[in-house]
Amino acid sequence: MKIRNILGLSAVAVALGVGLTACGSKNNSQSSNDAKTQTLNLAASTRLDTIDISKAGGYGSTGNVYESFYRLGEKGSITPGLATKGYSSKDGKTWTFKLRDAKFSDGSPITANDFVYSWRRTVTPSTKAQYAYLFNAVKNGDAIRSGKMNPDKLGIEAVDKHTVKIHLTKPVAYFKTLMAYPLFGPQSEAAVKKYGDKYGTNSKYMVYSGPFKMINWNGTGDKWAYVKNNQYWDKKVVKLNRINYSLVSNPATSLNLYNQGSIDITPLATDQLKNYQNDPNLKDYSYSMISYLRYNFNDKDAQKKAIINNDNIRRAISLSINRSVLSQKVLYLKSDPITGFVPKGLARDPETGKDFADQQGVKDTLDYNPKLAKQLWNKGLKELGVKNISLNLLTSNENANSTVATQYLKEQLESNLSGLTLNLTSVPSKIASQREQSGDFDISLDTWGGDFNDPITFLQIPQRGTSYNYGKYNSKKYNDLVNQAENVDANDASKRWQDLVNASKELNLTQGVSPLFQDDTYYLKQPKVEGVIHNTAGTQWNYKYTYIK
């Protein structure tokens, strides 16, 4: 999941899908009323840009209004969704799903054809779906996405009204988990045609398949709400009647509203967290999210391109950063020291149960070693035939955390690497993202959050040809290892795992990206709120079983 606000609380809140209600203090009678009406009040740090599942840039909370074959339960478990069962062929290349009797929020039946239509719509190039690459393993998905084949050739078919069959080009180890992602859910062709260009631009121009449906969102507004979807197949277990959201971009304002009782959950900025360490309502609702330095290997400036493509220069930059100080003293994070591009807690070895993050580390890559850094730096300067280097670090200006982190990086790098000038370029997150996509940067401070609980959700990002590989990192060894994992060894869990471990080690050795820290996010939650399901990847917030006591 690409986090638009490059580092910072706003980015985290967007990823986590937190949302909110109107300002003002609540008394006990109002809190009691929330219990009677089963109303949850949340804060959103940024406006929604779309509710079209084909075009969305993330699905942190939209799993509450959309549903696929499965949905994520506690600790990333796969729980029933629109399918009553799903099974694969012996070679892992064919999946069959049996659908339950279910309806969209407008009362129309959800059928196998709605899945077929949805998938075809998403991979159609003109849709410009950000996550279309996740369909590459579906037969003809890559060819369709690149405009070489018609969408009706996609490897998905409606065998009958309640049976969907999917044909893959290779086994996908995490396919079942992927099928819990709203991206792969059904869309009503009738609704898309009815609303035309308006589809997904307003809450009333959409039909919903999840526990809730959205109301009062006009595409740009500061307030919207989820209300119980009375057409939902499992509506009997849904206790909340309404979830109110309001835009509150300032962390201090959000915290004040929480303390007044106006909102029920609020994220804490780093400068706020230190004052709530012992609060009984403090909750660790972290996301599998890595903040890292992205290098532009295809820099438009020829001299800078040569600098960035020098292995010694990149390793020197990485070894000059004291990550422990940055995460624990500067940003007040509690997460373990980072070991590579895959965060801790995302995935475990299928044989030993060991965390992937404990296996990917490589000495003298992410350590703080200023002595070795200087040696490599001087070697790189000599190879380049220069004595001084000036590079620009691109970041977002939409949160104070970004400013703090980049100032620390500038101080560390310039003090440890003689001849380096690091210029900070701080712009709105939307502009930063546009500049990355157009290749208009030297180095950027970026963030990625896991879409599902498998290392590939991170390791596919620096792979050649991936749409999010804005820096154009291209290592033959790295690409070969990832391809080996996803093709030759795709049906052998142990071999695939080792391929990915080796790929992550190669990424460390080459510093194709320089991981900085794993974000951890703490929230305050009102004790009256129960049943919130939180996951570290994918659809992070599940309010299906939430209630106000």
Which residue ranges define each predicted feature?
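Extracytoplasmic/peripheral linker and loop segments enriched in polar/acidic and small residues
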Residues: 419-432, 459-526, 549
